[in-house]
Structures are given as structure tokens and as C-alpha cells.
UniProtKB/Swiss-Prot annotation:
InterPro entries tied to this protein: A-amylase/branching_C, Branching_enzy, Glyco_hydro_13_cat_dom, Glyco_hydro_13_N, Glyco_hydro_b, Glycoside_hydrolase_SF, Ig-like_fold, Ig_E-set
Subcellular location: Plastid, Chloroplast; Plastid, Amyloplast
UniProt protein name: 1,4-alpha-glucan-branching enzyme 2, chloroplastic/amyloplastic
CDD domains: AmyAc_bac_euk_BE, E_set_GBE_euk_N
GO cellular component: amyloplast; chloroplast; cytoplasm
Classification of source organism: Eukaryota, Viridiplantae, Streptophyta, Embryophyta, Tracheophyta
């Protein structure tokens, strides 16, 4: 769509061009189609009522006079014709070939479809009728904000490109720097460019708390800020004078021997900028996600790099049969041990692992391999750091966050966003857009969503499934509406993008489309499954209840897709245990070599490790996730390098002498064919390729025909496949009859007991199993199999 804008003349700060002897100056500003700021005034409560009123009051925007003020990146700048702005379309964008995507995008209009009535959720689940007032209020608030954004910001598409207005943006004339800091009394740009002189480049403030300065190019036409220069903003605030990294900074680094990070003006020469060459893959029918962390992805005890990950780790992910890689800790975080979850610089990729161009080359290589790249994005909270983060940015307790106790997460020691604030919406929506647009990520896994959606943050609360727990006074409606907006934005502009939410509460409508009245995620993490396996592993498997296992795996809301997992990075952290460690414990260190006799503990552990993973994939959801190394039972936990620490509670936690020894992944163990880890890895690979071939996770047909408690046998159908699990510790069953829906001949397509997978080769793979015209377990046909103890076998009809 195109929208019209009107002109205005305002005042602003400008620095005289360097090397010209110029002095104080002023600029004429003109109004453009990209509105600058809205409704975030000093002392504003941040509620949507005040936010909307402030938005309506805004009628002018400040930008320096000139042809281009960085309104669009130089790669795909939208041109102004008269007073109309044509917004390019993403719906048919590709990244194949240098510049192809940008050229195509210029010829199309990007649109986020308008809201509907949001009533379909009541047809999908009539039980929601009892909570119609809450849900309709939620949807009306979403519609109102969409309307305000359309009216005052030119729509979600323009609003989410605010990174082209805030922070540093280069134009043909120079560089404009803008920052929202309503609490500051004065502000100045400081850094290498002016020898950190706070009097050299003072900024001016408008009525909405936005500070700004325009730096003209040098007399010789060169940039007023050289690429790679250190930059900060010095502000006189209610808390005193402080230097802060710009909130919208695109890159930051930690100088050797220093603790706080420095912001870096990042604008490399054209010949250095990475050009994407490969098209982004289409969204697969089912997701098989390999969860990763770049820094700890090396077998060596060190911080790994984007480049090494690109060259060494991506090919192994492809070989293993996964079709998506989820990368943690991309957003800059000054504390490495936070696993990337205490974000300090939201628009900056972590410099520990390399440069932004290195990250782009990683993503492009993944696309070449046909892998989706999902980013583990953190919008649920922010680091409490004041030196290099957003906390206390303008010297106030509020700014981007709630004030008082509501703005502090007592368990995570982090700050909590005020999602009812207009500028918070601008910042976070633009942040999501930035990673998709600039780096070509294919979607997000949103971290800590439960903490966002409830004022109790899901802490010390047990969710029982009662709808009052989801649609009551404990629900942070502003946060839920933000999630609706960000999903609306992502799916409207990038239809192939994937969004996954980490929600432990099971909120109804969470994974239903926004236009139907839902929150809008494509998937929710099926977090109860991993918890169930840990509970079971604390017991003897002789006591496991088959019906209990099946219930946990299949306990999902209709039409709301799930990504399931037996374990993720959470279980691999120090203080917890992986499934392999629960099963085999210290025996893993002494009895995993094939030239040494095994033990009953190892035999049991390897067998159950394979069974747990396959039944989780088979019944647990429409997507599957594995954390790197767990596919082969990685024997070491994760312990980031750290010194001693005293928590706010007063509890003392000893350090590990800043060692990297347990902060790595020993892929060499899974690759070593003389170790039993190799067989476990081979099974996981076969499991992924089986799903790739048969797409059973997303099959419309699922039928669980047997949950036999005495036999410890589970039998179910997914598509045309028949899965047989025998969890009994001793009993193997000959001529065991199982039901099926199709007549014919069945063959083995996956056998956990195969010698290749570290099993005992008790199944004859060449055997053909002919169905009988006799019903069994409420199935019209049946056939007989041999099912050894602690095995899982998958049968498929012979073509």
C-alpha cells in the first residue's frame, strides 16, 4: 500500500562538517512517511490509553533536509515520488543471486493483512465462550493498536523499520543518530570520532524525549564516523552522568582487559559487505530442529566462531537429517555464562563469535544446504546491566521497563519490558524485523514467553489446565497483545517464516492464527514431555505406566501444533542431567568402548535412550527438537567459564576457574566407530531420515491401538507406518499380534535393536509380514511380529 504524508518545518541539532572550519548550524527538517516517535513521554504510565492519546497528538516528524536520511538501507532503499512512499513487498522475495531479492522487493508492496473479527477461536473451542469477555477485550486492544499504528506510523510495515530512523543511519549527506531517552537532561555523542569530548557533538531533544544529531560528511566526502569507531552516548540523567551503548547499536565489542562493552559504528566498505547468494528454503511440512550454540560448538575447550560453525557444524547437521538449525545466544550478551539470555544489545550479533558478515555467511551456507535457520530471540526480559545494557539507560527505573518490583524478575535478576509502552513496541517489533531482514533468519523461537504472559511469570505456580489460569487478572494482556503484533508482523511480511513460543503454561489459542483470535505462533514448545521423562527416569522402568507416557505425549490442544523434545539445552546444563546421564551415569566414562565388555547399565541405557527419542518424535508433536550432542548421549554437562558469584539472595556459588573444559561439544565421540556413542548417533540419524521420507509427524492419521500395562507394549499408527515399542525389561514376545488399518505386506524400516545402532540384532529385517483379515485392537487387519525386550521397531507397507 502507499500512504501520503504532509510537510512540516522543525528544528534540530547538526554538527558542522569536519575539516571545513564550520561552526554552529541549524537545519530545516521535513516530514516523511516514517514517523519518528510516539506517545512515550517522561512520566508516562505506559498504558495503552496514554500511549494511544500520545500517538494521536503526534503530527510531525524530524528528519534532516536532504534526499535521503537513511530511510531505507542502501541495499533496498525505497524512493520517494512526490509525497507518497511505496513500501516494498516481502511475500515473494527470494535471496537467490546477488541483489536479486532487493531488486524484486522494490517492485512489490509489503503489507500486513488487516485484522479480522477474531471470532473463529470460539468455533474451534466452544469452551472459550465462557471467557469471551477477556478474549474479545484482548482482540479489541490488538485491533486498536493496529489502527493507531496505521494512522500515526503508516502501518506495521513502516513502524517495524524504525531501525532506519533510530540509532545510526547513513545518508548521502552524512550520519544521523537518534535515541529515545526522555529521562535525560542532556545528551552528547562521544567516541573515537571526537576523542570522547562531550562538548563536541551535543544532541538536541524533541518534545517526545528523542535526542538527535546530524553529522555531515567530511569535506572530502568521507563518512564523519569511520567504520569500526567506538561510540557511546553520554547523558546527564537523574542518576548522574553516564556513558551508555546506543540502544539500537548494530555491533558491540569487549576490549581486551575491559569489562563493559563498547558500541561500534558498523558500516563496512561495500567490498566487505556479505552478499547473500542462496534462496531461503521453503518452510518444511514438519520441523526437525537441531538446537545449537555457536560458542560451545567446538570439540576444543574454547569459544567457537561463526566461520568454524559454518564449515564444520552445518554439514554434520545436514548429514544427520535435520532440516532446521536453531541458534542460541545470537543477540549480544556481556555475560557469556548467561547462555545468551541476558541480552545487552538487542540489534547486535554477538561479537565473541565473529563479525556480522561472518554470521551472514553462516546463514547463507545453511540455506545452501537446505536448512532453515531459527534464532532463539529474547524479548521476555533484558540484562540488568547498566554499563552496557538498557537498564537505567536514561537514568530512570522505567524507560523500556516497568517501574518498581514489576520491572524486575526476582529469579533471573533481569529487567522486564513494559509492553504497554509505544516505544517498547517500536523497539521490539523493529528488532524482530531487523533479524529477518538484515540477516535472513527464517524465524524465531521466542524464549521465556510464559514469563511475559503472566504477572507471576509462571513462578511458583502450577498450571492445571483450568481456563481461569489463562484468562484472569494474572494475565499480562499488554504482553499477549505484543506477541499477537509480532506474530502478525512476521507472518504478514514473511509468510514462510516460522515462530515457536516457549510456553510452559499451555495457554489456549497460543498457536492459533491472530486473525482467528489466537496469539499467532506456528508452534508451541511441548515442554511437559521433557519433564515427564525426567520424572520417569528417577524411577525404575519396571514401574513405568504405558498409558501415562502416551497421555503426556499426546496431551495437546487441537489445531495447535507443538515442537516436542525429549531433552533440550536445559537438561544439559550443570546442575541437571541429560537422559543419557540419568540412564548410564558414571558407566559412560568406562564402558563405551566396543573393545571392552558392556554392562547391564550401559545396555539398558542405550536401549532406552533410543526408545525415548523415537516415541517422543512419533507421538509428541508436529515438530521435533534435539540439542547438539544429545543425539549420541553426550557424556559431559555444560558449564560455562565462570568465577565465584554471590546472588542477590546472598547465596554463594563457587566458580570453575573460568574453565572452558565443560563448555564444548565432543562430536568426535559420536563419530568414533569404536565407541558405543556412534551407534546412538547412527540411530538418531536413521530416525531423522525416516521422518524425512514418510513425514509421519504431520500425518493426518494417528491411531494408538495398544497401551498394554502388563506387557509394557505400546503400538500406534502414524500415516501408513506402524510403531511397536516393548518397554519390558525382560520379556520378549514371539508371534505378537498387532493391528493395522491397511492390508498387505509389511517390512521393517527402522529397528533400534540393529547392530549398527548398538543393539543385539534380534530382528530379521528381510522378513515379510503378511496381514490377516482378522481385526485386532479395534483395527480391521493385523499381523504378527517378534518384539524383543527394550526395543522399538517401525513397520511400513511394501510398495
Amino acid at each position: 500500500m502507499a500512504f501520503r504524508v504532509s510537510g512540516a518545518v522543525l528544528g534540530g541539532a547538526v554538527r558542522a562538517p569536519r575539516l571545513t572550519g564550520g561552526g554552529e548550524g541549524s537545519l530545516v527538517f521535513r516530514h516523511t512517511g516514517l514517523f519518528l516517535t510516539r506517545g512515550a513521554r517522561v512520566g508516562c504510565s505506559g498504558t495503552h490509553g496514554a500511549m494511544r492519546a500520545a500517538a494521536a497528538a503526534r503530527k510531525a516528524v524530524m528528519v534532516p533536509e536532504g534526499e535521503n536520511d537513511g530511510l531505507a538501507s542502501r541495499a533496498d532503499s525505497a524512493q520517494f515520488q512526490s509525497d507518497e512512499l511505496e513500501v516494498p513487498d516481502i511475500s515473494e522475495e527470494t535471496t537467490c543471486g546477488a541483489g536479486v531479492a532487493d531488486a524484486q522487493a522494490l517492485n512489490r508492496v509489503r503489507v500486513v493483512p488487516p485484522p479480522s473479527d477474531g471470532q473463529k477461536i470460539f468455533q474451534i473451542d466452544p469452551m472459550l465462550q465462557g471467557y469471551k469477555y477477556h478474549l474479545e477485550y484482548r482482540y479489541s486492544l490488538y485491533r486498536r493498536i493496529r489502527s493507531d499504528i496505521d494512522e500515526h506510523e503508516g502501518g506495521l510495515e513502516a513502524f517495524s523499520r524504525s531501525y532506519e530512523k533510530f540509532g545510526f543511519n547513513a545518508s548521502a549527506e552524512g550520519i544521523t543518530y537518534r535515541e529515545w531517552a526522555p529521562g535525560a537532561f542532556s545528551a552528547a555523542l562521544v567516541g573515537d570520532v571526537n576523542n570522547w569530548d562531550p562538548n563536541a557533538d551535543r544532541m538536541s531533544k524533541n518534545e517526545f524525549g528523542v535526542w538527535e544529531i546530524f553529522l555531515p560528511n567530511n569535506a572530502d566526502g568521507t563518512s564523519p564516523i569511520p567504520h569500526g569507531s567506538r561510540v557511546k552516548v553520554r547523558m546527564d540523567t537523574p542518576s548522574g552522568i553516564k556513558d551508555s551503548i546506543p540502544a539500537w547499536i548494530k555491533y558491540s565489542v569487549q576490549a581486551p582487559g575491559e569489562i563493559p562493552y563498547d558500541g561500534i559504528y558498523y558500516d563496512p566498505p561495500e567490498e566487505v559487505k556479505y552478499v547473500f547468494r542462496h534462496a531461503q528454503p521453503k518452510r518444511p511440512k514438519s520441523l526437525r530442529i537441531y538446537e545449537t550454540h555457536v560458542g560451545m560448538s567446538s570439540p576444543e575447550p574454547k569459544i567457537n566462531t561463526y566461520v568454524n560453525f559454518r564449515d564444520e557444524v552445518l554439514p554434520r547437521i545436514k548429514k544427520l537429517g535435520y532440516n532446521a538449525v536453531q541458534i542460541m545466544a545470537i543477540q549480544e550478551h556481556s555475560y557469556y555464562g548467561s547462555f545468551g539470555y541476558h541480552v545487552t544489545n538487542f540489534f547486535a550479533p554477538s561479537s565473541r563469535f565473529g563479525t556480522p558478515e561472518d554470521l551472514k555467511s553462516l546463514i547463507d551456507r545453511a540455506h545452501e544446504l537446505g536448512l532453515l535457520v531459527l534464532m532463539d530471540v529474547v524479548h521476555s526480559h533484558a540484562s540488568s546491566n547498566t554499563l552496557d545494557g538498557l537498564n537505567g539507560f536514561d537514568g530512570t527505573d522505567t524507560h523500556y521497563f516497568h517501574s518498581g518490583p514489576r520491572g524486575h524478575h526476582w529469579m533471573w535478576d533481569s529487567r522486564l519490558f513494559n509492553y504497554g509502552n509505544w516505544e517498547v513496541l517500536r523497539f521490539l517489533l523493529s528488532n524482530a524485523r531487523w533479524w529477518l531482514e538484515e540477516y535472513k533468519f527464517d524465524g524465531f523461537r521466542f524464549d521465556g514467553v510464559t514469563s511475559m504472559m503472566y504477572t507471576h511469570h509462571g513462578l511458583q505456580v502450577t498450571f492445571t489446565g483450568n481456563f481461569n489460569e489463562y484468562f484472569g487478572f494474572a494475565t499480562d494482556v499488554d504482553a499477549v497483545v505484543y506477541l499477537m503484533l509480532v506474530n502478525d508482523l512476521i507472518h504478514g511480511l514473511y509468510p514462510e517464516a516460522v515462530t515457536i513460543g516457549e510456553d510452559v503454561s499451555g495457554m489456549p489459542t497460543f498457536a492459533l492464527p491472530v486473525h482467528d483470535g489466537g496469539v499467532g505462533f506456528d508452534y508451541r514448545m511441548h515442554m511437559a514431555v521433557a519433564d515427564k521423562w525426567i520424572d520417569l527416569l528417577k524411577q525404575s522402568d519396571e514401574t513405568w505406566k504405558m498409558g501415562d507416557i502416551v497421555h503426556t505425549l499426546t496431551n495437546r490442544r487441537w489445531l495447535e501444533k507443538c515442537v516436542t523434545y525429549a531433552e533440550s539445552h536445559d537438561q544439559a546444563l550443570v546442575g541437571d542431567k541429560t537422559i543419557a546421564f540419568w540412564l548410564m551415569d558414571k558407566d559412560m566414562y568406562d564402558f563405551m568402548a566396543l573393545d571392552r565388555p558392556s554392562t547391564p547399565t550401559i545396555d539398558r541405557g542405550i536401549a532406552l535412550h533410543k526408545m525415548i527419542r523415537l516415541i517422543t518424535m512419533g507421538l509428541g508433536g508436529e515438530g521435533y527438537l534435539n540439542f547438539m550432542g544429545n543425539e549420541f548421549g553426550h557424556p559431559e554437562w555444560i558449564d560455562f567459564p565462570r568465577g565465584p558469584q554471590r546472588l542477590p539472595s546472598g547465596k554463594f556459588i563457587p566458580g570453575n576457574n573460568n574453565s572452558y573444559d565443560k563448555c564444548r561439544r565432543r562430536f568426535d565421540l559420536g563419530d568414533a566407530d569404536y565407541l558405543r556413542y556412534h551407534g546412538m548417533q547412527e540411530f538418531d540419524q536413521a530416525m531423522q531420515h525416516l521422518e524425512q521420507k514418510y513425514e509421519f509427524m504431520t500425518s493426518d492419521h494417528q491411531y494408538i491401538s495398544r497401551k498394554h500395562e502388563e506387557d509394557k507394549v505400546i503400538v500406534f499408527e502414524k500415516g501408513d507406518l506402524v510403531f511397536v515399542f516393548n518397554f519390558h525389561c525382560n520379556n520378549s514376545y514371539f508371534d505378537y499380534r498387532i493391528g493395522c488399518r491397511k492390508p498387505g505386506v509389511y517390512k521393517v524400516v527402522l529397528d533400534s535393536d540393529a547392530g549398527l545402532f548398538g543393539g543385539f540384532s534380534r530382528i530379521h529385517h528381510a522378513a515379510e509380514h503378511f496381514t490377516a483379515d482378522c481385526s485386532h485392537d479395534n483395527r480391521p487387519y493385523s499381523f504378527s511380529v517378534y518384539t524383543p525386550s527394550r526395543t522399538c521397531v517401525v513397520y511400513a507397507p511394501v510398495e
